[in-house]
């Protein structure tokens, strides 16, 4: 899956939604949050028509045994400013993680989407920025909803730093939580590569439904007790003290989702 992001090279939002290329973070923002539904898959093609078994990137069954997510990441900075990167992976059936909140002021292509596909490249490795943007963020309601559910307590009362906050495991099924420090130790920036394997090894039952002779396909999990739920990947970046708008971080990825069908 190719990297797509809703950020510009400045770290600001793209005016017309996600585009192909790295995700960018500005040092002026205390925290920048990206989120992605890694298991979002329909049984229909982006351009219309049903998926077939010869299309390896498409699912053709409502129940899939998810093996895991493989990802090769490249992170680079343009200055010696240090960064903290926290990755959290979790499973959930809560619709607040996959739907845009009506309270957002964003509209059209700038509205929150938990995954992105198009007719050329199919499903993408999306980095959708929910926070930051130098005060121009228009997905505040969705951002608050997601983080209120994910973390224990309230920001500013029970915690301040999202890279230190405890995940609320009563509300989500935590699968992975790791903090990585990015620092050059000299006057140059850093360029580092990471390989991540996130195992799942559970069934995912998609919320498909019949409509006469037509099967209405959903990209998301059912809300009942069947299956593991949607597998979400959240990346949080925080700059070190003294960072400014001139300090930038870029992240790109090549990702693959593996599953078996029943």
What are these regions (language model features)?
Residues 63-66, 188-236:
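Eukaryote-biased detector of low-complexity, proline/serine/threonine-rich segments
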Residues 1-53:
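N-terminal leader/pro-regions and domain N-caps
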Residues 1-4, 89, 165-175, 195-199, ...:
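Generic preference for hydrophobic/aromatic residues in regular secondary structure cores
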């Amino acid at each position: 899956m190719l990297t797509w992001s809703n950020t510009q090279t400045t770290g600001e939002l793209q005016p017309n939604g996600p585009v192909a290329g790295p995700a960018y973070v500005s040092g002026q923002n205390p925290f920048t949050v990206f989120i992605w539904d890694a298991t979002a898959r329909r049984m229909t093609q982006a351009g219309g028509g049903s998926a077939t078994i010869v299309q390896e990137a498409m699912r053709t069954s409502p129940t899939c045994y998810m093996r895991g997510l493989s990802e090769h990441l490249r992170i680079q900075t343009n200055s010696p400013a240090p960064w903290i990167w926290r990755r959290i992976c979790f499973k959930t059936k809560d619709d607040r993680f996959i739907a845009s909140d009506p309270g957002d002021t964003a509209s059209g292509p700038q509205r929150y989407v938990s995954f992105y596909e198009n007719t050329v490249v199919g499903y993408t490795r999306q980095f959708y920025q929910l926070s930051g943007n130098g005060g121009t963020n228009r997905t505040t309601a969705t951002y608050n909803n997601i983080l209120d559910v994910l973390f224990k307590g309230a920001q500013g009362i029970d915690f301040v730093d999202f890279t230190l906050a405890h995940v609320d495991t009563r509300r989500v099924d935590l699968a992975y939580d790791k903090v990585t420090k990015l620092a050059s130790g000299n006057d140059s920036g850093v360029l580092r590569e990471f390989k991540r394997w996130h195992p799942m090894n559970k069934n995912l039952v998609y919320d498909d439904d019949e409509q006469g002779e037509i099967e209405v396909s959903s990209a998301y999990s059912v809300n009942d007790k069947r299956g593991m739920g949607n597998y979400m990947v959240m990346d949080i970046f925080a700059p070190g003290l003294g960072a400014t708008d001139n300090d930038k971080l870029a992240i790109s990825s090549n990702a693959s989702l593996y599953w078996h069908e029943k």
